From Swiss-Prot:
Organism annotation: Homo sapiens (Human)
Example GO biological process: cell differentiation
Induction note: By pregnancy.
Cofactor: record remark: No monooxygenase catalytic activity in the absence of NADPH.
Keywords: Developmental protein, Differentiation, FAD, Flavoprotein, Growth regulation, Monooxygenase, NADP, Oxidoreductase, Phosphoprotein
Recorded GO MF terms: growth factor activity
Cofactor: NADPH
Listed EC numbers: 1.14.13.-
Name this polypeptide is given: Oxidative stress-induced growth inhibitor 1
Amino acid sequence: MSSSRKDHLGASSSEPLPVIIVGNGPSGICLSYLLSGYTPYTKPDAIHPHPLLQRKLTEAPGVSILDQDLDYLSEGLEGRSQSPVALLFDALLRPDTDFGGNMKSVLTWKHRKEHAIPHVVLGRNLPGGAWHSIEGSMVILSQGQWMGLPDLEVKDWMQKKRRGLRNSRATAGDIAHYYRDYVVKKGLGHNFVSGAVVTAVEWGTPDPSSCGAQDSSPLFQVSGFLTRNQAQQPFSLWARNVVLATGTFDSPARLGIPGEALPFIHHELSALEAATRVGAVTPASDPVLIIGAGLSAADAVLYARHYNIPVIHAFRRAVDDPGLVFNQLPKMLYPEYHKVHQMMREQSILSPSPYEGYRSLPRHQLLCFKEDCQAVFQDLEGVEKVFGVSLVLVLIGSHPDLSFLPGAGADFAVDPDQPLSAKRNPIDVDPFTYQSTRQEGLYAMGPLAGDNFVRFVQGGALAVASSLLRKETRKPP
């Protein structure tokens, strides 16, 4: 972090910024890249395999994608995202990836410094966000090429680091390092402030003496504290626009049952890693109980199996439920996850086990935990079952922490009467600008707006950058 940004954050009064980005994960990094003047154009000789998109691209030669009509360009595109702009940017960056191809991007990038918009990116961690909190050796779900940001492919970065991609997939540590390196290589570091915790984002008309504003237009006030040398330094900044890019890993989901606060109950895989390192959990221990039927739970099963730690794996759904994520993953790309799914299907707690040390407990409801390290379940027939365990991992998802917003952000959700949820009730945004439908100047991107894969969050950055550039162009001098 540059000293200028530290000074800027430490000041309680300054000229309002055009943009503050809250969150420094892939979404925030990509948006910072676009706001720093890096501008995408179609290569003059590029031919896109999608005929309709190719025709539209030839209609405006020499015009940047940011300056074109994103609604028009994205019309007719289909893919694995509900966001039309996400599909558009993905199609431009990776034209035939869904068909197994490796065609190069049809985009070329120019650095137009005169179009840069001053901004600051606030994050608790180093650039890369929650990727720095994931166990580094864990192989990531997505193919490595889908984790990359504009104009620096993960594959090329890995080769320069004298490393190769295993099965086209990288580790979480690789990706965290890549994102941090991306900020450095693209010269974005002066925009980023790590160790910044945002505690409030409020909208109102400031006292001109407090923010140096030239007029009395309403602004966002972003308050919080900067952690430095084990001390907390408060800050308060004003901005015309705020972009929420915090992701959803802030607050692990909880079961809400008696005993969940007991010390042997955990909600992160790192607890099992720590217990294994210090010998608190061994192959001779009582089983580790893993709750959940998603990829985080599968990662925990794989980790425990690697260290020969006995596992009871419990989940509410049936193993053949089409909604299970395992039923949506290609077996060739994700053999280890399909192995877990096979174990879940075959290893009922009531049947003999060809997989020593693993038992599944499908379609069971967890009732409570007891202080003597026992977990009480109920099956479909209402029969209670009690198991002794050494440690419990509750891995059933996570929720965004938007406690810094009024009403924890629920007022901005698609259904304001329900809790905010990245999968079921995201922030309601315009699909072509990602601006909140309920608050001018407030944007949301990434999982908060319903884009849950790095591959598609970049489309949100494109939409936000295009909208902000239009605003700044219209703003009177």
